[in-house]
Amino acid sequence: MKKLALLGALALSVLSLPTFAADKPVRIGIEAAYPPFSLKTPDGQLAGFDVDIGNALCEEMKVQCKWVEQEFDGLIPALKVRKIDAILSSMTITDERKRSVDFTNKYYNTPARFVMKEGASLNDPKADLKGKKAGVLRGSTADRYASAELTPAGVEVVRYNSQQEANMDLVAGRLDAVVADSVNLEDGFLKTDAGKGYAFVGPQLTDAKYFGEGVGIAVRKGDSELAGKFNAAIDALRANGKYKQIQDKYFSFDVYGSN
């Protein structure tokens, strides 16, 4: 019995080993098709607000970091099986996700919005979209909102592996609306040639039940050391001006949101 107990204790200690170590890279998972937060440059390099923030955090923490690309709905499974050590991919902090992973403090917070053709009216999304199609990023907070609120109201919710795919189907006429983070939709769609003739409609979506407490960095359950290092680095970037420097590269407003 003592041997079994010892083996059990050893197994538990292995499972709960912290990720953070100065002599090995921190593997950060990201879905690289969510501009302006994450995207690929023409030469195949990762770029965007999330990438710049992540690189600055790693520099502040004095650790080497390795970006690992993954479809959004595969990020948490990859974290849980230790293919990656953290997720920095515009992932909103929600109670549902906190049952699977731990989060740092937020590093930004923006509302979700609907986009439809210019001139469309959307006073009541559930009533006005009944019998129509709305596109969402699979596994996102918009997906959660749409599943709980739109599907029961008779809206056909169509899920995509990237927001860009949803936007393209809107332009192609296969969708009546898309719903996602407002900044992503503005910079990644409305300000592009493809987004001409489309506009925000309806209310800002901020219900914490669906849209959480802001966007944070996810780590494995119990990895308080890595989460603590990230939190300290976020605070440092906010204090030393580097956060604002990165923010101003992409946005004309305070993307961090109210404290």
Curated annotation (Swiss-Prot):
Induction: Part of the aot operon that encodes proteins involved in the uptake of arginine and ornithine. Expression of the aot operon is strongly induced by arginine, via the HTH-type transcriptional regulator ArgR. Keywords: Amino-acid transport, Periplasm, Signal, Transport. Disruption phenotype: Deletion of the aotJQMOP genes greatly reduces arginine and ornithine uptake. Disruption mutant has a reduced capacity to use arginine and ornithine as sole carbon source for growth. Residues 1-21 form the signal peptide. It is found in: Periplasm. Belongs to the bacterial solute-binding protein 3 family. This is L-arginine-binding protein. The gene is aotJ.
